[in-house]
């Protein structure tokens, strides 16, 4: 280590350091002149034999190395002279690393560089100091180039240099731009499509190099192509798309059932208009309601006429004389529609001042039935809303008809007159009540059976 300390105090090295630290403009030229002088001394053969020791050539070789590296550093000094101290510290470190390397090289080059010696020094005698000197000169040049390349490789590994030119120099219009995908650095001029000012200076803009943009375009095209490839898969899915078509008949069936329900009510109205009793089955589609109304109608028809119910219905209808006509119209119409032939005859009798011979004629019921058809069809909605009529009997309907005629004039008096007219009209139609009640019971039973059958069919369909 003492030898290395003595080597650092070499006058040529100190002179080179002085030129390196100096801020004068001529320092670079003086340093170059010193380099040339040291190189001339190194080549001079008369100077080499005079030095018996091997160490002085080592010193000269280290000087050569140091001076070779100094011009590079000094070339950057005019741009920034303040960096001289930092560079000298790096220089000293490099020198300290080189000296042990020189000793190793002197041992290695004796075996490695012997074939090179005859080519370089044919006229000279191969004395040991010359061989050591020449071997040291050659590896030093190689070492310097190796260190330069290693520094460049280090900069490349760290990602600090341009990928194209492998340099870290940055000019005003030639900055290093980083690709956001591969994170490689490019000079703006080195990149083949030159980077514009907008791309380089806009911090919001993400810049990609040409290679990465090509790769990204390929990836984008690949990602767009796969949806086109499974087009046959979409065709294979079409059976699944056909499933809704299979399901559509079910929806159609549901629509048909709802539509049939409407048809069913229309059919029921037609049967009711044809002369069957208990219009409750027309108004309500629920089977429980139908059975209740039909049973109630059968019981009341077998029990006979009840004037109290008739009076209650007429009183309810005549409670408000202004609205009673509107409320009683559907009652009278449904009564017309649901009454049997005997009932129609009794209505005619009550309207025609109780003549017993008229109810036996068939034409009047036909005409009345037609009028009932037209009126009941026009007032279906009203009869569905109102419906005190289902509980009315055959004589009740006739009494309500007569009450309709009288209720427009007076409320309670109309009800009393309707009672009297119903009593008077019941006497001529008494002979016809028996068969009409039986017919109504039979019709109610038939309807119940039909409703039960239809309900069972619905359940089976579901």
UniProtKB/Swiss-Prot annotation:
Query: What biological-process GO terms show up in the record?
Result: regulation of transcription elongation by RNA polymerase II; RNA polymerase II transcription initiation surveillance; snRNA 3'-end processing; snRNA processing
Primary residence: nucleus
Q: Name one GO molecular function term.
A: zinc ion binding
Q: According to the UniProt record, where is the region Disordered? A: 42-132, 301-462
> Which residue ranges have biased composition labelled Polar residues?
59-86, 301-328
Stretches of Basic and acidic residues bias are at 88-124
What is the documented function of this protein?
Component of the integrator complex, a multiprotein complex that terminates RNA polymerase II (Pol II) transcription in the promoter-proximal region of genes.
Q: Which gene encodes it?
A: INTS12
Quote any Pfam family the record assigns: PHD
Using the UniProt entry, state the residues involved in the cross-link Glycyl lysine isopeptide (Lys-Gly) (interchain with G-Cter in SUMO2), renumbered to this chain.
68, 254
Q: Where is the composition biased (Basic residues)?
A: 449-462
Q: What is this protein called?
A: Integrator complex subunit 12
Q: How does it assemble?
A: Component of the Integrator complex, composed of core subunits INTS1, INTS2, INTS3, INTS4, INTS5, INTS6, INTS7, INTS8, INTS9/RC74, INTS10, INTS11/CPSF3L, INTS12, INTS13, INTS14 and INTS15. The core complex associates with protein phosphatase 2A subunits PPP2CA and PPP2R1A, to form the Integrator-PP2A (INTAC) complex.
**Which keywords label this protein?**
Isopeptide bond, Metal-binding, Nucleus, Phosphoprotein, Ubl conjugation, Zinc, Zinc-finger
Q: How is it modified after translation?
A: Dephosphorylated at Ser-128 by the PNUTS-PP1 complex, promoting RNA polymerase II transcription pause-release.
ZnF (PHD-type) spans are 159-215
Q: Where in the cell is it found?
A: Nucleus
Q: Which top-rank group of organisms is this from?
A: Eukaryota
Q: Which family does it belong to?
A: Belongs to the Integrator subunit 12 family.
Q: Which InterPro entries match?
A: Int12_PHD (IPR039054), Integrator_subunit_12 (IPR051776), Zinc_finger_PHD-type_CS (IPR019786), Znf_FYVE_PHD (IPR011011), Znf_PHD (IPR001965), Znf_PHD-finger (IPR019787), Znf_RING/FYVE/PHD (IPR013083)
Choose one Gene Ontology CC annotation of this protein and give it.
nucleoplasm
Q: In which organism is this protein found?
A: Homo sapiens
**Low complexity: bias regions:** 347-358, 382-437
UniProt modified residues of type Phosphoserine? 128
Q: Which SMART domains match?
A: PHD
